[in-house]
Amino acid sequence: MDYINAALLGVIEGITEFLPISSTGHLIIAEQWLGHRSDMFNIVIQAGAILAVTIIYWRRLLDLVLGWREPENRDYAAKLIVAFLITAILGLVVKKLGFELPETATPIAWALIIGGIWMIFAEWAAARKAPHKEITWLVAILVGIAQIVAGVFPGTSRSGATIFVAMLAGTGNRAAATEFAFLVGIPTMYAASGYELLKTFKDGGAAGEDWTALAIAFIVSTIVAFIAVKWLLAYIRSNRFTLFAIYRIILGVLLLGMATSGLIA
């Protein structure tokens, strides 16, 4: 893989990983022109995006750790832990059962379309309720489950699934729902990436990798994800997610058309 392609894939990952539009759907299209991505490459560019969100929320994370004696912080941290543990336990069960859908265009396209419709419904439902900021135990449990659903069905979007489950379950405030979804995503994605990284090294999948290309992709992904998430957090203060939903539906229809015409697998 040449360095320009590595940088472009880093840009795509950085933009799409935490926006509710599915990084998988975009990367599968990019793969047609930029070449196949190795497992190691996927892990590295995702790690860059996770690092960006960790940097953005480092003060909030530090506050939760240092301020654990405060009831509000302790309660919030406990809900983050429960959501993470639900994802971890169910994730291990899914792995053991070997249930996994192929990352091919048609199922991803349908996940994009259905997810877009789901987002529109969630926005409509949330608008009919008071914009509560509270993260309830129900929200924490459902967010944990939503992360697994997103992992099992490529194209769902982890951020999209968790944000809109939180909104439907009672956290009508977009900023509060997004923050919880992103904070849960940090340990979840670090754990998943760490597991996949160890597995890749164990299987010899890191042999022959171009480490310069990996470094470029990682750095680009980190920088672009930082900018994208900062923009998203500012955007949702006064805007709905409807544009993202429409974009998902259009992209899903486009992918279906490409799959039907044989332009993409």
Curated annotation (Swiss-Prot):
Keywords: Antibiotic resistance, Cell inner membrane, Cell membrane, Cell shape, Cell wall biogenesis/degradation, Hydrolase, Membrane, Peptidoglycan synthesis, Transmembrane, Transmembrane helix
Keyword RNA-binding among UniProt keywords: no
Catalytic activity annotation: di-trans,octa-cis-undecaprenyl diphosphate + H2O = di-trans,octa-cis-undecaprenyl phosphate + phosphate + H(+)
Gene Ontology cellular-component annotations: plasma membrane
Top-level taxon of the source organism: Bacteria
The EC number(s) this enzyme carries: 3.6.1.27
Localization of this protein: Cell inner membrane
Annotated coiled-coil segments of the chain: none
Major enzyme class: hydrolase
Keyword match Transmembrane: yes
Transmembrane segments: 38-58, 80-100, 107-127, 135-155, 175-195, 213-233, 244-264
Other facts: Bacitracin is thought to be involved in the inhibition of peptidoglycan synthesis by sequestering undecaprenyl diphosphate, thereby reducing the pool of lipid carrier available.
NCBIfam families xrefs: PRK00281.1-4
Protein name, entry field: Undecaprenyl-diphosphatase
Species lineage: Bacteria, Pseudomonadati, Pseudomonadota, Alphaproteobacteria, Hyphomicrobiales
